[in-house]
């Protein structure tokens, strides 16, 4: 669970809150505002098919098979005792959705909304980590090539023309090597590996700079 909050609009009070902090709760007529600081971020489900190893499906497609959202990715937001009508939900002045008082009374899962600021923050972290993974994979393919083919030839970390020539002998017979060969040709150069390592370090540092939840201004405004 990411967080859970339940607010009584009529009494302008927080009924329950879990793994979050609610402050500056104010009611102005039928409208409601408060500051919301969750102690965790929602898990951003990638809706883009990455096609790795022939895979054509996205993470979000998997939600049809497992109850991940219901059991793990819950950012519950409930407001009871609102005047009957439709309400515009904004977070940090960003429009999220128009919701009925009935739906708000039942509660909604904010983790289902990819347009919330907290979801967008989590998505940035996801993309940075995916980039880190892609660079790290180059090292794995380089080492796989070294230990799967060159070690038995007495050419472990030789990284020279003799090693290249030996790999070329294996290329017609091994499809995995054909997929990794271009990365080996690049990674055999220590200068390139150093650049990749520094890039990964920079990515990780950026992730840790932006991965802390921040306080958001939540507003419910009656629209009809």
Regions found by a protein language model. Give the residues of each.
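Conserved catalytic region of serine esterases and O-acyltransferases that act on ester linkages
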Residues: 1-224
């Amino acid at each position: 669970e990411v967080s859970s909050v339940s607010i009584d609009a009529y009494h302008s009070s927080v009924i329950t809150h879990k793994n979050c902090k609610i402050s500056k709760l104010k009611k102005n007529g039928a409208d409601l505002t408060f500051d919301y600081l969750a102690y965790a971020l929602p898990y951003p489900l990638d809706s883009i098919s990455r096609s790795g190893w022939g895979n054509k499906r996205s993470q979000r497609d998997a939600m049809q098979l497992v109850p991940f959202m219901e059991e793990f990715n819950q950012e519950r937001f409930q407001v009871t005792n609102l005047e009957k009508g439709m309400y515009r939900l904004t977070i940090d002045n960003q429009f999220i959705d128009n919701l009925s008082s009935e739906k708000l009374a039942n509660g909604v899962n904010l983790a289902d909304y990819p347009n919330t600021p907290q979801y967008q923050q989590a998505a940035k972290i996801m993309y940075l980590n995916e980039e880190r993974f892609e660079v790290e994979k180059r090292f794995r393919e380089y080492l796989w090539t070294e230990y799967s083919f060159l070690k038995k030839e007495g050419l472990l970390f030789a990284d020279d023309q003799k090693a290249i020539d030996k790999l070329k002998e294996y290329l017609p017979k091994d499809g995995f090597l054909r997929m990794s060969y271009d990365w080996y040709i690049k990674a055999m150069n220590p200068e390139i590996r150093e650049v990749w390592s520094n890039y990964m370090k920079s990515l990780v540092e950026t992730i840790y700079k932006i991965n802390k939840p921040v306080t958001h201004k939540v507003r419910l405004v009656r629209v009809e």
